[in-house]
Each structure stands twice: as structure tokens, then as C-alpha cells.
UniProtKB/Swiss-Prot annotation:
NCBIfam families: sensory_box
An example Gene Ontology molecular-function term: inward rectifier potassium channel activity
Protein origin, superkingdom: Eukaryota
Organism of derivation: Mus musculus
Membrane topology term: Multi-pass membrane protein
Name listed for the protein in its UniProt record: Voltage-gated inwardly rectifying potassium channel KCNH7
Encoding gene per record: Kcnh7
Keyword Glycoprotein tagged: yes
Modified residues (Phosphoserine): S174, S238, S319, S891, S894
Assembly information from the UniProt record: The potassium channel is probably composed of a homo- or heterotetrameric complex of pore-forming alpha subunits that can associate only within their subfamily.
Length: 1195
């Protein structure tokens, strides 16, 4: 595998560094963004929450002046001093009285420290809070020293006039002699809940006129300006609100020196300039206009006026002496200024801003260095404060990155030297120390032996490697690259330093010169210490553990190396024993006899050569390790036999461990490695196919490598699927145990509920710089941050920094539909997040209602990502969808009417034969569709049920009105195509067209009633429904659909029964065919029920002709009665007798027609089915008659 670079990807470690440095010292601090208005709080630690009693969601996005901690006893000049430090971007420490959430007070030292980015621009503020004990208060008689005098100069005021407000007055007094830092300002009535600040209007010429120069004499005194108006406590504080003037005796003690003046109404205040750039903005010329120092945040606080004789050398001072010396900053009332640069060319006016505003200063003015005192107080170490940016690890000079190319090449070189040491050290110790030729070479000097020179070079290389290891970075447990030399040295001392040091000592060089046997043996033993360098190889083995071929090759090399070592030992045993053996039975003597090179005691050079000895020894060890040997080289002495036994034992273990696992190694070669390379190949193919650009390509590859290192290629979902569900729940509960225990919302849940929640949680790993949620994304999940830190940005402005145990998303129980994100969420470091889908969470809460209330009450989002207008917009969208749905229905019906009128106009010229043919085809279609009417009923929405029932009920009456006159169609103004409408139970468009044809005269009848429209509005616009309410409404809707289906089934059965009774048909009145004499028209009966649905009014006689006015009146009345049935109204029943008499007359006249004409029509009867009709009376309800209606009397 390549060198792991995932650990060293650029990441923002700002939050982690601050927490690590502060939490260990039990600090209580907040972090504020200096580039936004009010310097909003974007992070607070747990110590601050415990100190104040406020939770983190309560503190986030509040101004860093901590207005919510202010109360009646909070000094205004202390608050103003904090505002001064924030405006000037300078470090300062102020003692302030704050209030707990429960209303109790505590005194706290507030320490403001600016944090800069790589350009030296202060991007954030760290505000640290320290308790002040009673002993410290007693030891400090005065927190602020009196003001030193300043020279009297012709100085003019910066006047801010508020003509609509009541202000305080002051009296002209003499000006002190020394105070070069003072800027005198007239302010309005103080805000009672914030350091910041009312809208300041641009000063006028009168406010900066020379006539006000003498007014400054009364302003600068050791005393404070006495408040002469009642100022209420902070609006947002939880403690009882009292009058501030009762709690400010120190502000009333100087009333004798500062009295009222009736001629002027203003309040004096003193502001200390924060930097030299502030003073550069002031000019002597009265026409100088000040430009807003922060171009992106114009807030309308432009100040102008003369200002001179100010010592810039004393400005921006942050030492304790200067803070105490120039103590007039404690006298500032609750207001904020935005000093601007001088610009004489033109005048820039900015729109007014909000009340609470602290304007971020200009970039170049935020270059104050953090003083040594700040570093001592915070104990931050050498790096003082981290920089808020995506940064690669800071590398000190002469420090080598552990993943650099040089280090990789050096490691391979050292590995080769280790292999050389492992091979030649045993060989030199066993074969060369007692060799006569080697002894002669040593006599001429250490450099005569080439092997000694190589050993010396190797020793030097290892010593250099030790020095390099002292300057090589490493990755700690937090996956951070450590480059501090001191930390590297400590880490190396605790690790491999001792082994490397012993292996690098050149022992043979240290004891060179003594030729005794004891020295020779000692040198041989000490040289074996170099074999400890092989431990370096173990450091690299895990990198190649995924490559089966590399592991197999490595094991084979280990096997050969062990055989080499054993061969050296085998020779050493025989060489040591040979002089003491009298019978010469050792394996060396046997070897000399076999190859014809016998030993001669008188000749030291006799016997086998070194090559023969080494090859024979190596042959013996290999044969013994792999088998029991062949016997040509055999042990003869006891020592040799014991060693042979040990070799056989080692051989059996080596053979079983190496060669027995060859198959497993090969399988791993095609398992883990195959998975890694296959996944990597997929990534590369994806990059190639989609032509991913290089920056994004590098991110993909680095994330894949890091994720593989992080999970070792294990898919947790696949692993969990192999276990039973109960075991999966236990595993998930263990994996999410920290989250479920630390989050307050999950406390008190039952074990079953926790198991269900754990099963729904998914773990997400995000690299630094990755955007988890984009602005505008649908919030489908709730996120819990378990490791790392993230930032939330709105328009590329950091609004919050979240760390461990923070929660972000939306309150899922408050909205029926998921909202959209209002910000981007981006990872600063490697993050682990637990997320649960919205539907899964609601499902669990629905299953455990007793836990639901507790969860929804205690769930506190650190940052709510839901857009502000999402809720109202969802309601408007639902209402708009309802209107669109209705418009689509109306337009669809109108199109159907147009097509229907066209068909009717085309059918006006059809003869009776075509009419009969269309009727027969329509009957077949009706028979085919009637069986499917139930499915149509079940698909109709509950809101459309009254409309549908009215339509079905009105259809038979329209057919009857048409057939009473033997007409197929009505006149052009209101005709209906009967053969297409009589059987259209399944087509809702046709069903609506039945109702809309006569509705042209009465448009209000086409739409549902007001009650129905109200029901539609409730069901379609009410979006804030819970899951249980939706289930209940669906159940009610299903019950209503079932009842409707049963009613329709009964209606269809009645229709089929009526169709079966009809055996004869009668031709219409205009037909030339006459009915037979035997035919007698049946009399129509009108069956009256207890609740009559409708009645038809008829006041005129009728003519069978379509041109007769009486006929048209009857048809009109019929259609009106149909519409009344559709809308559910009740009509009079007085006309039923009239209709019955008319029908009897019609039946008498029909006897003169030809019987053949009776067969031309056979119209099906539609049974009315109203919503309130019961099953018992549905069979006899309404008007029943046979189909044939040849005409009326008088034809």
C-alpha cells in the first residue's frame, strides 16, 4: 500500500487545539466571530455552561458581550470596557459582575484574546472567564486607578444629537491636564440591555461647531457621570428587574462635581481610542469626513469633527500599567462607535444598522500581537494560539515529514542495510573470527579487511538514522501529525531508541587490538546484537499485510534466514568441540575425510575451506528443517545431536507455520487485497469515466485510502446482516453506547427503545473540508457529532463551530414535512457523526409514546438548520397545491364539455338506425364496465364522495327526461349524449360532465358546497399532522370507501334486475314504425319514501316534439331537479302527482305505435344512491319505470 496520507490531509484543528489547551486547565471560555455584527458567539465549552447555568443552545448566536449575563449590579463602564476591547481588537482583562441563570451574582475576570489567521487578521475572539474570590477582591482596593490629568487644549466634541429623546445634562468645568487617549462623545439615553448601541446619525455642523469647545471642560474628571434617569435592567435577564440607580452608589458619589445644566441636554462619556489608526481618522479640519472602516458592514456611525494633540505613542497599549493609568475607559456609557478613515474627497453615508451592533474593525487594525501576559495566563505554550484555517501540519525547520519522498528512500536504504546485517553478522562471528587469514588482516590494521570497512559504514548509517528519527514527524493517537522536536524525542525515547542504539554500537571497533580468545568470543556475541535491527522490519510489515504475495515472499526469506543462522551455529559447535575431541568424530573431521581435506594439527591451514564448511552446514540445516535429513552429514557428538534435535523441532514449526499456511496466504491474496484493489479500481474507473478534475480526484483517492485504513475495508452493514436481529441490536447498542448515554434526550428511555434507536442510527465518517449539508438541502436526518469539529456557514460566514456531543438538524416533531437547510455544514477535521433518518425517528417515537414526550422535551439542537420561512411556506405550498388540483379538475371537465358538445353537434344529423347501433354498442360497454365499478369507487378520494354520489343520483333523472320525448339528444344549447353518459361509472370526467352540462346557467352548482370546500382546505392545507393522526384519518377514509363500495354494489344489482325484466322495446315518437295493438304501455309508479329526495315541478302541458315550448320547460325542470339532487338540496314533493298523471297519459297514447318500434330502445335504469340512503330502502327509492317512452299525448 502507498504511504498513508489520510492522516495528514489539511484540516482545521482550531477547536481541538483550543479545547485541549483550555479544558486541561478547567477554563471557562467562549469563541466569537469577529467578522460579523455583534461578534456572535459560535462556540462555548462545558465549563462556561456550568458556570452560568445556560445551555449551549441558549448561548449560541448571542453577542459575545454576554448581555444575557448582565443585571442591575453589572457596571456599565465594565461593559463598555469589553466593548472597547472588541472594537479595537485588543487583548484586555476586565472584572465584571455577572448573573447566573437562576438570578444569583458572581464576580468574574473576563479576559478577551484575539485570534488571527495566517495573514495576521483577527478573525475570532476567545473570551475566558475566571472566578474572582473574596480574597482577591479584598487584596484589590481599587480596580481602576483615577484618571491622570491632561493638558488643556482647544478640543472639540463629537456630538451625536438625538432630537427626539430625553437626555442628561452636564455643567461646564475645567479640563484636566493629562489624558491623551480621551475622545469625548455625547450619547443618547442608554440602552438597558446591551453594550451596543443605538443608531447614530451623521453629525451636523452645529454639533461640531467651535462653540462647543468649552463644554469639554466639564467632562473629564475622576468621577463618573451621574445617571439622572431611571434605567431599567436588562430585558433578557432572568433575574428580577430593579432600578439601576438604586444599585449604583459609586455613580452617585460624584454628583457634587457634575450637576445639571438647563441650557444643554446630553450625557458625557469618554472613549479611549483603540489604535493609532483610530486617531489617524481624526483631523483638525472640520470638513473631514470619516469613511466606514469596514466596507462590508456599513452601519451608519460616521463621525466627524476636529481632533488634535493626541499622542499616538500611547494608543493601543495593553499592559497593566497603561490599563490602570488610562482608566477613563471605565467611564464609557452603553454605546459603540465605528471610527473611520479620513476621506476628504467625498462624503459617505451608510444606512442605519440594528440596535445591538459591534462593528468589526478594519483588517489592518487587527494586527496587535498577543502579549506575553496572555500567554502566561492561558498557558498556551510556544504556539500561543492556533490559527483558524485549513492548514497542513506546521513543520519546524530541519524536521522531516514521515511521508516525504526522502524518508521513503531512506527507509528502503536502511532496510537493505538491516538485511546485510542479518546475513553477515552471524557469518562473520562464526566463520571469520577464528580464520587465520582474517587474523593476519587484522594485524595490518582495521582498514585492511574490506568487511570491516563495510561494517563501519553500516554502523555510521545507523547512527545517522537515529539522528533522523529524532527529527521525523509521527502521527499521534488523535491522528494529528506531531512536528515538535521535543515531543518527537520523547516519543522516540519511549519507543525504538534503545534497540536502535544498541544495534548501532560498533563493538568490534571499540575493543579492536586485543587478540585473546576471550575478546574474540566477546566480539562475536556482541555483533549478534545488531540483529535487533531486524525489529525495524516489523514496523513495515503491517504496511504490506494486505499483499499476500509480499507476505509469502517475506515468510520464505525468514525461513532462509533462520536456516542461515542455524548453519552458522552448527559450524560454531563443530569448530569449538574439534580441538577437545580425541577421536576426531565431529562433523568437521567427517567432512574433511569425505572431501579429502583432512585436518593436520601441525598445519593450521589444513582442513576444508570456509566455503566448504558454510555450504555443508547450510545443506544440513535446510535438510533438517524441511525433513529428517539424508544422513550424509550427520551429528556424531552429543552437542551436535542436541542441536539437531532443536533444528528438527524448529523445522517442524516453521514447516507447519509457513508452508502449511501457503494456501491461506494465497486466499488472502485474492480476498482482502482483491477487495482493496477492486474498490480502488472502481474509484479510478469512475474518475476516468466522468473525467473528474485533479483536485477532486485527489480528494476521492485520499478519502478512500483513509476510509480503508479506518475500517480496514470492513462493511459494517454486511457484517451485521450475518447475525440474528437480537444480536444486531446488541451490537448497535454497543456501537452507539456513548451517544445514547451522553445525550440528555435519550436518558430515561427503556432498553427496548434504546435498542430500536440504535438499530436506526447510521455512522458517517467525514474528512476535513467535506460538506455534509449544503444550503437548500432537504433535512432528512438528525445529526449527532461524536468526534471532530465542524463549522456552519451562511454566505461563507462562520456562524457556529460545533464539537463533540453537539446536535444539528431540525426539530422533526414540529413539522409534518422536512424543511430545507439554511446553511452549509462543513467538516473541519476528521469527523464521526451518528445520524438517524427523520422517518425512522418518528417511527420509533410512535412505537414508544411514553418516551416520545421525554425525548421531544429534552432534545436541544445546538444549531437548528431549518429555514425560518420553511413552516409558513409549507402551508402556502399546500394551499397552492389544493388550488392547482381544483383548477386542473375544472379545466379537465371543461375540455370534456367541449369535446362533448362537438360530438353532439356531429350527431344531430344521425338517423334512427345509427342511433340504435350506438345504443347497442353502449350497452355492451356498460356490461363490461359495470363489474369494475367497485374498483373505481375505492379509488375516489373522500373529498370527492359527495360530488360523485350526487352525479350518480342525477343521471337516471336526466335520462328519463330525455326519453320521455323519445329524443336521443337535447337541443344544441343543452343536449347530452345519452349513449356515452349512461354507462360511464368508471370515467370520472364523464361523470363530472353529466353534472356540468346544465350547470352553464348555474355555475355555482358545479362546485362542491361550502362545507365540502372547507373540508378540502383542512385536509390539503393542514401540514402539521403527526404520524398517528395520518394513520387515523386513513383508517376513517378506508371505512367510508368500504361503505360506498357496498352501496354501489347494491345499486348495480338493482340495475341488473331491472334490465332482466325488460323484454320489449318501443320505437321513439318520430319513427315511422307503429306499435302493435296488443301492446299496452305500463304505468309508471312513483314510490314515496319517508325522506323524499326530490320532486319535479310541472305547470305546463308537454308536446312530443323537441320544438314545443312545453317540452323544453319540462326538460329544463328535469335538469334543475337533477342539479338539486347533485347538491344535496331538498325540493318540493307536490309535483309527483302531476308527473304521474302525465306519464299515464303518455302510456295511453303509446298503444297506437307499431310493436317493431318498441325494440329500438332498451335503456338501463340507474338506481340513485345518496350518501344517507340505507341498504334497506335503496331498492324502492326513487323513480322506477320501463324503458319505452314513445311520446306524450297530443302528438
Amino acid at each position: 500500500m502507498p504511504v498513508r496520507r489520510g492522516h495528514v490531509a489539511p484540516q482545521n484543528t482550531f477547536l481541538g487545539t483550543i479545547i485541549r489547551k483550555f479544558e486541561g486547565q478547567n477554563k471557562k471560555f467562549i469563541i466569537a466571530n469577529a467578522r460579523v455584527q455583534n461578534c456572535a458567539i459560535i462556540y462555548c465549552n462545558d465549563g462556561f455552561c456550568e458556570m452560568t447555568g445556560f445551555s449551549r443552545p441558549d448561548v449560541m448566536q448571542k453577542p459575545c458581550t454576554c448581555d444575557f449575563l448582565h443585571g442591575p449590579e453589572t457596571k456599565r463602564h465594565d461593559i463598555a470596557q469589553i466593548a472597547q476591547a472588541l472594537l479595537g481588537s485588543e487583548e484586555r482583562k476586565v472584572e465584571v459582575t455577572y448573573y447566573h441563570k437562576n438570578g444569583s451574582t458572581f464576580i468574574c475576570n473576563t479576559h478577551i484574546i484575539p485570534v488571527k489567521n495566517q495573514e495576521g487578521v483577527a478573525m475570532m475572539f476567545i473570551i475566558n472567564f475566571e472566578y474572582v474570590t473574596d480574597e482577591e477582591n479584598a487584596a484589590t482596593p481599587e480596580r481602576v486607578n483615577p484618571i491622570l490629568p491632561v493638558k488643556t487644549v482647544n478640543r472639540k466634541l463629537f456630538g451625536f444629537k438625538f432630537p427626539g429623546l430625553r437626555v442628561l445634562t452636564y455643567r461646564k468645568q475645567s479640563l484636566p491636564q493629562e489624558d491623551p487617549d480621551v475622545v469625548v462623545i455625547d450619547s443618547s439615553k442608554h440602552s438597558d440591555d446591551s453594550v451596543a448601541m443605538k443608531h447614530f446619525k451623521s453629525p451636523t455642523k452645529e454639533s461640531c461647531s467651535p462653540s462647543e469647545a468649552d463644554d469639554t471642560k466639564a467632562l473629564i474628571q475622576p468621577s463618573q457621570c451621574s445617571p439622572l434617569v431611571n434605567i431599567s435592567g436588562p430585558l433578557d435577564h432572568s433575574s428580577p428587574k430593579r432600578q439601576w440607580d438604586r444599585l449604583y452608589p459609586d455613580m452617585l458619589q460624584s454628583s457634587s462635581q457634575l450637576t445639571h445644566s438647563r441650557s444643554r441636554e446630553s450625557l458625557c462619556s469618554i472613549r479611549r481610542a483603540s489604535s493609532v489608526h483610530d486617531i489617524e481618522g481624526f483631523s483638525v479640519h472640520p470638513k473631514n469626513i470619516f469613511r466606514d472602516r469596514h466596507a462590508s458592514e456599513d452601519n451608519g456611525r460616521n463621525v466627524k469633527g476636529p481632533f488634535n494633540h493626541i499622542k499616538s505613542s500611547l494608543l493601543g497599549s495593553t499592559s497593566d500599567s497603561n490599563l490602570n493609568k488610562y482608566s477613563t475607559i471605565n467611564k464609557i456609557p452603553q454605546l459603540t462607535l465605528n471610527f473611520s478613515d479620513v476621506k476628504t474627497e467625498k462624503k459617505n453615508t451608510s444606512p442605519p444598522s440594528s440596535d445591538k451592533t459591534i462593528i468589526a474593525p478594519k483588517v489592518k487594525e487587527r494586527t496587535h500581537n498577543v502579549t506575553e501576559k496572555v500567554t502566561q495566563v492561558l498557558s498556551l505554550g510556544a504556539d500561543v494560539l492556533p490559527e483558524y484555517k485549513l492548514q497542513t501540519p506546521r513543520i519546524n525547520k530541519f524536521t522531516i515529514l514521515h511521508y516525504s519522498p526522502f524518508k521513503a528512500v531512506w527507509d528502503w536504504l536502511i532496510l537493505l542495510l538491516v538485511i546485510y546485517t542479518a546475513i553477515f553478522t552471524p557469518y562473520s562471528a562464526a566463520f571469520l573470527l577464528n580464520d587465520r587469514e582474517e587474523q593476519k588482516r587484522r594485524e595490518c590494521g582495521y582498514s585492511c579487511s574490506p568487511l570491516n570497512v563495510v561494517d563501519l559504514i553500516v554502523d555510521i548509517m545507523f547512527i545517522i538514522d537515529i539522528l533522523i528519527n529524532f527529527r521525523t514527524t509521527y502521527v499521534n493517537q488523535n491522528e494529528e501529525v506531531v512536528s515538535d522536536p521535543a515531543k518527537i524525542a520523547i516519543h522516540y525515547f519511549k519507543g525504538w531508541f534503545l534497540i536502535d542504539m544498541v544495534a548501532a554500537i560498533p563493538f568490534d571497533l571499540l575493543i579492536f587490538g586485543s587478540g585473546s580468545d576471550e575478546t574474540t568470543t566477546l566480539i562475536g556475541l556482541l555483533k549478534t546484537a545488531r540483529l535487533l535491527r531486524l525489529v525495524r522490519v516489523a514496523r513495515k510489515l503491517d504496511r504490506y499485510s494486505e499483499y499476500g504475495a509480499a507476505v509469502l515472499m517475506l515468510l520464505m526469506c525468514i525461513f532462509a534466514l533462520i536456516a542461515h543462522w542455524l548453519a552458522c551455529i552448527w559450524y560454531a559447535i563443530g569448530n569449538v568441540e574439534r580441538p577437545y575431541l580425541t577421536d576426531k568424530i565431529g562433523w568437521l573431521d567427517s567432512l574433511g575425510t569425505q572431501i579429502g581435506k583432512r585436518y593436520n594439527d601441525s598445519d593450521s591451514s589444513s582442513g576444508p575451506s570456509i566455503k566448504d564448511k558454510y555450504v555443508t552446514a547450510l545443506y544440513f540445516t535446510f535438510s533438517s528443517l524441511t525433513s529428517v535429513g539424508f544422513g550424509n552429514v550427520s551429528p556424531n557428538t552429543n552437542s551436535e545431536k542436541i542441536f539437531s534435535i532443536c533444528v528438527m523441532l524448529i523445522g517442524s514449526l516453521m514447516y507447519a507455520s509457513i508452508f502449511g499456511n501457503v494456501s491461506a496466504i494465497i486466499q488472502r491474496l485474492y480476498s482482502g487485497t482483491a477487495r482493496y484493489h477492486m474498490q480502488m479500481l472502481r474509484v479510478k474507473e469512475f474518475i476516468r469515466f466522468h473525467q473528474i478534475p485533479n483536485p477532486l480526484r485527489q480528494r476521492l483517492e485520499e478519502y478512500f485510502q483513509h476510509a480503508w485504513t479506518y475500517t480496514n475495508g470492513i462493511d459494517m452493514n454486511m457484517v451485521l446482516k450475518g447475525f440474528p436481529e437480537c444480536l444486531q441490536a446488541d451490537i448497535c447498542l454497543h456501537l452507539n453506547q456513548t451517544l445514547l448515554q451522553n445525550c440528555k434526550a435519550f436518558r430515561g428511555a427503556s432498553k427496548g427503545c434504546l435498542r430500536a434507536l440504535a438499530m436506526k442510527f447510521k455512522t458517517t465518517h467525514a474528512p476535513p473540508g467535506d460538506t455534509l449539508v449544503h444550503c437548500g438541502d432537504v433535512l432528512t436526518a438528525l445529526y449527532f457529532l461524536s468526534r471532530g469539529s465542524i463549522e456552519i456557514l451562511k454566505d461563507d460566514i462562520v456562524v457556529a463551530i460545533l464539537g463533540k456531543n453537539d446536535i444539528f438538524g431540525e426539530m422533526v416533531h414540529l413539522y409534518a414535512k422536512p424543511g430545507k437547510s439554511n446553511a452549509d455544514v462543513r467538516a473541519l477535521t476528521y469527523c464521526d457523526l451518528h445520524k438517524i433518518q427523520r422517518e425512522d425517528l418518528l417511527e420509533v417515537l410512535d412505537m414508544y409514546p411514553e418516551f416520545s414526550d421525554h425525548f421531544l422535551t429534552n432534545l436541544e439542537l445546538t444549531f437548528n438548520l431549518r429555514h425560518e420561512s420553511a413552516k409558513s411556506q409549507s402551508v402556502n405550498d399546500s394551499e397552492g397545491d389544493t388550488g392547482k388540483l381544483r383548477r386542473r379538475r375544472l379545466s379537465f371537465e371543461s375540455e370534456g364539455e367541449k369535446d362533448f358538445s362537438k360530438e353532439n353537434s356531429a350527431n344531430d344529423a344521425d338517423d334512427s338506425t345509427d342511433t340504435i347501433r350506438r345504443y347497442q354498442s353502449s350497452k355492451k360497454h356498460f356490461e363490461e364496465r359495470k363489474s369494475r365499478s367497485s374498483s373505481f369507487i375505492s379509488s375516489i378520494d373522500d373529498e370527492q364522495k359527495p360530488l360523485f354520489l350526487g352525479t350518480v343520483d342525477s343521471t337516471p333523472r336526466m335520462v328519463k327526461a330525455t326519453r320521455l320525448h323519445g329524443e336521443e339528444t337535447m337541443p344544441h344549447s343543452g343536449r347530452i349524449h345519452t349513449e356515452k353518459r349512461s354507462h360511464s361509472c368508471r370515467d370520472i370526467t364523464d361523470t363530472h360532465s353529466w353534472e356540468r352540462e346544465p350547470a352553464r346557467a348555474q355555475p355555482e352548482e358545479c362546485s362542491p358546497s361550502g362545507l365540502q370546500r372547507a373540508a378540502w382546505g383542512v385536509s390539503e392545507t393542514e401540514s402539521d399532522l403527526t404520524y398517528g393522526e395520518v394513520e387515523q384519518r386513513l383508517d376513517l377514509l378506508q371505512e367510508q370507501l368500504n361503505r360506498l363500495e357496498s352501496q354501489m354494489t347494491t345499486d348495480i344489482q338493482a340495475i341488473l334486475q331491472l334490465l332482466q325484466k325488460q323484454t320489449t322495446v318501443v320505437p321513439p315518437a318520430y319513427s315511422m314504425v307503429t306499435a302493435g295493438a296488443e301492446y299496452q304501455r305500463p304505468i309508471l309508479r312513483l314510490l314515496r319514501t319517508s325522506h323524499p329526495r326530490a320532486s319535479i315541478k310541472t305547470d305546463r302541458s308537454f308536446s312530443p316534439s323537441s320544438q314545443c315550448p312545453e317540452f323544453l320547460d319540462l326538460e329544463k325542470s328535469k335538469l334543475q331537479s337533477k342539479e338539486s339532487l347533485s347538491s344535496g338540496r331538498r325540493l318540493n314533493t307536490a309535483s309527483e302527482d302531476n308527473l304521474t298523471s302525465l306519464l299515464k297519459q303518455d302510456s295511453d297514447a303509446s298503444s297506437e305505435l307499431d310493436p317493431r318500434q318498441r325494440k329500438t330502445y332498451l335503456h338501463p335504469i340507474r338506481h340513485p344512491s345518496l350518501p344517507d340512503s340505507s341498504l334497506s330502502t335503496v331498492g324502492i327509492l326513487g323513480l322506477h319505470r320501463h324503458v319505452s317512452d314513445p311520446g306524450l299525448p297530443g302528438k
